[in-house]
Amino acid sequence: MTGKPAIDVISFGCRLNTFEAEIMKREAAAAGLGAADAVPAVIINTCAVTGEAVRQARQAVRRARRDNPSARIIVTGCAAQTEGETFARMDEVDAVIGNDDKLKADSYRSLPDFGVSAEEKVRINDIMSVRETAGHMVDAIEGRARAIVQVQNGCDHRCTFCIIPFGRGNSRSVPMGAAVAQVRRLVDAGYREVVLSGVDMTSWGADLPGAPRLGTLVQAILRHVPDLPRLRLSSIDSIEADPALLDAIGTEMRLMPHLHLSLQAGDNMILKRMKRRHSREDAIAFCVDMRSRRPDIVYGADIIAGFPTETDAMFENSLRLVEECGLTHLHVFPFSPRKGTPAARMPQMPKAVGKERAALLRARGEAAHAAHLARLVGTRQRILVEREGLGRAEDFTLADITVGAPGEIVEAEIIGQTGERLVTRPLMAAAA
């Protein structure tokens, strides 16, 4: 025995879950879970975005029990919060902990005994009653060259397809000082790139005194942590982007030229039925405007295929959005009805139609991505080495890289492409 707590955290879904996994492991260890003289523990940190995500979590639970017959198996995350009984009924599960409690050591100190009833396994509070999100400090993100900082949690919007507000609660912001201090701490630990993350990140600040906006936070981080080479945003809602954020994207070269947009669809009627806050014209205008400010900017987007009532013509509008917005990195999901959401009660499309349309969207996205890679051939790019042989350019494109240690930034010439990656010829280690 090495004395290191035997705790394995398996995370599904978003970057926020990845960040929270580090906190959960630390808090569970502080509570004595998985100690050298105790049984090992496996924590499954679930996602609730789609039915497939829940299925994969259940599969992970069964696999964890097969691989670790004597371990304590704990299920938490968004799917645990929204449908805890689903996991509590599984014989393999020892405890189900809600999204708020999973970040507290006390939640792991008094776990239920083996073999208790499903009701006794569940430790879930009312997520809607949570009013604050602590600025949790982490010194490292295990196995990653870039660090993630949570600045916001929850969502005040109620899109008709989305279960996440019921898994994460209403929007809460990490205070600016705590967020800046966390970035400072990670840069001091050697990280060259920090990713700001949240559930609805462009709503950051609305619940804080004075209601500051996300752009103010971004500018504060860049100002107070001048030795941070790369700051990246995760997903944003373009209709909520404030003027200070737009200015920062256009002028701050340390803010990476990659935006992942929560678009969801390209047809106005479908957007209305989704209860989104933007139109297709809004999305296109935003992308055109940002590209005029920052010509090297690259867009990713979430798009749902086969939403209830989506006709062929409506779907074509989503397909055309790839070109009209200049999208490069697509996250495509066939519509998945989530119990309790308004969209689950709408007239449903056949699953085969959703899968077929998702495949068409992915193919359109892959073609756009290949064209983007081809345009980069002959340019110079700064590559953050993620692991041996692989890194990412500033626009989040994967690149083969033959030199540099994980976490090092290397300047390289792009000499070709292979699959979804750039082929590079290293020139030198880049200065911060």
Label for each model-derived stretch:
Residues 11, 198, 235, 263-265, ...:
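Active-site proximal loops enriched in glycine and acidic residues that flank catalytic Cys/His/Asp
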Residues 70, 111-121, 206-215, 223-227, ...:
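Short, glycine- and charge-enriched coil/turn segments that flank and shape catalytic ligand pockets
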Residues 159, 196, 233, 261, ...:
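Conserved, mostly hydrophobic/aromatic
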Residues 337, 345-432:
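Terminal RNA-binding accessory module
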